[in-house]
């Protein structure tokens, strides 16, 4: 497993920045003042560079919603009981969740991935069964996952991305479902980005002040308990992460290895993206951060990464909802790039010198 993981990392190539001039020249020749479409032009530029072409296409999109349970839920850090995780997976499989509506609206396929739910699901056409274990261990008492389990989850996610590329998908999005997963996400940010737990811990699904203070204490305890196992990014992910977070990390690494961009959802998915970046800094150029989460700390995380999310809608649901919305903006930017007339083709006079 370790050899395959190292091969995955080695297969991630830097993007070709030499495309920049050709893409910019085309954007500047469109029938508009240069730069007047603002971030749409930036997004089109990034997509072209990530995909390695000045003639981009986007015909197939897919959202992967990774699900997993967390042992740390036993510490009472969430407003909801752990059994909500499988219940929400069933809701997604039945078409009733927000991500079902928004992925459909975006014209994206949706697949739910069981990475570590504490429940056994029957086969379903929308479900991919990649279960590593029935939930992570309680990170407040020791490592959430072993290194082998973490690698298994990462490689499963990577294989999903590589398979999607082979099936003709050109853009992927991440989502997640897992009660208590803002707790491991916050711990990952704290260690990997050297951020204060107190400053970035939020209310998740809506906990009160008393439980928020308790959540902060649990995260700080988990970091201290696992202090001896935090030497590398992989060890940090194993000790303080979760199966769905590791799966998303793998999806990002796998997509980058085949030159495919990924739209990252909110607070949880961004923690997986941080893990992927720490494992291979080259993946940054393949990532679109979809939205600024309303979860406390996400703004500071984005600033640390030097990232500017596409949307700011006060979302804090997860599931991939923000990523599905942002996919539509990316698609709009590419339609501008591909379908607008140029000054030369339309016979429109350019700007006076």
From Swiss-Prot:
It catalyses: 5,6-dimethylbenzimidazole + nicotinate beta-D-ribonucleotide = alpha-ribazole 5'-phosphate + nicotinate + H(+). Its EC number is 2.4.2.21. GO terms for molecular function: nicotinate-nucleotide-dimethylbenzimidazole phosphoribosyltransferase activity. The keyword Glycosyltransferase applies. CDD domains: DMB-PRT_CobT (cd02439). The active site is at residue 319. InterPro entries: Nict_dMeBzImd_PRibTrfase, Nict_dMeBzImd_PRibTrfase_bact, Nict_dMeBzImd_PRibTrfase_N, Nict_dMeBzImd_PRibTrfase_sf. Keywords: Cobalamin biosynthesis, Glycosyltransferase, Transferase. Pfam families: DBI_PRT. One of its GO terms (biological process) is cobalamin biosynthetic process. Pathway: Nucleoside biosynthesis; alpha-ribazole biosynthesis; alpha-ribazole from 5,6-dimethylbenzimidazole: step 1/2. It is an enzyme of class 2 (transferase). PANTHER family: NICOTINATE-NUCLEOTIDE--DIMETHYLBENZIMIDAZOLE PHOSPHORIBOSYLTRANSFERASE. Catalyzes the synthesis of alpha-ribazole-5'-phosphate from nicotinate mononucleotide (NAMN) and 5,6-dimethylbenzimidazole (DMB). Belongs to the CobT family. This is Nicotinate-nucleotide--dimethylbenzimidazole phosphoribosyltransferase. It comes from Chlorobaculum parvum (strain DSM 263 / NCIMB 8327).
């Amino acid at each position: 497993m370790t050899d395959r993981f190292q091969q995955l990392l080695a297969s991630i190539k830097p993007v070709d920045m030499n495309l920049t001039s050709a893409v910019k020249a085309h954007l500047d020749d469109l029938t508009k003042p240069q730069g007047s479409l603002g971030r749409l032009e930036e997004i089109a530029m990034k997509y072209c560079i990530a995909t390695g072409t000045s003639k981009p296409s986007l015909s197939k999109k897919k959202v992967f919603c990774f699900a997993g349970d967390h042992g740390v839920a036993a510490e009472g850090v969430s407003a909801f009981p752990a059994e909500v995780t499988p219940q929400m997976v069933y809701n997604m499989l039945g078409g009733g969740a927000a991500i079902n509506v928004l992925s459909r609206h975006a014209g994206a396929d949706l697949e739910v991935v069981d990475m570590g739910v504490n429940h056994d699901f029957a086969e379903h056409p929308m479900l991919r069964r990649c279960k590593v274990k029935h939930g992570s261990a309680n990170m407040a008492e020791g490592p959430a996952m072993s290194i082998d389990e973490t690698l298994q989850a990462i490689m499963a996610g990577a294989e999903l991305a590589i398979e999607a590329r082979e099936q003709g998908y050109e853009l992927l999005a991440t989502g997640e479902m897992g009660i208590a997963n803002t707790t491991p996400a916050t711990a990952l940010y704290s260690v990997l980005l050297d951020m204060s737990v107190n400053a970035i811990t939020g209310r998740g699904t809506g906990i009160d002040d008393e439980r928020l203070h308790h959540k902060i204490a649990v995260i700080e305890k988990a970091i201290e308990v696992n202090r001896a196992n935090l030497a590398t990014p992989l060890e940090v992910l194993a000790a303080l992460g979760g199966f769905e977070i590791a799966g998303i990390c793998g999806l990002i690494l796998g997509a980058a290895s085949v030159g495919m961009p990924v739209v990252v959802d909110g607070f949880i998915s961004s923690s997986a993206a941080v893990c992927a970046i720490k494992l291979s800094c080259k993946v940054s150029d393949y990532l679109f951060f979809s939205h600024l989460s309303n979860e406390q700390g996400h703004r500071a995380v984005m600033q640390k990464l030097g990232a500017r999310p596409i949307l700011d809608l006060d979302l804090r649901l997860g599931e991939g909802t923000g990523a599905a919305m942002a996919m539509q903006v990316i698609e709009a930017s590419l339609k501008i790039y591909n379908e607008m007339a140029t000054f030369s083709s339309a016979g429109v006079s350019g700007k006076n010198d």
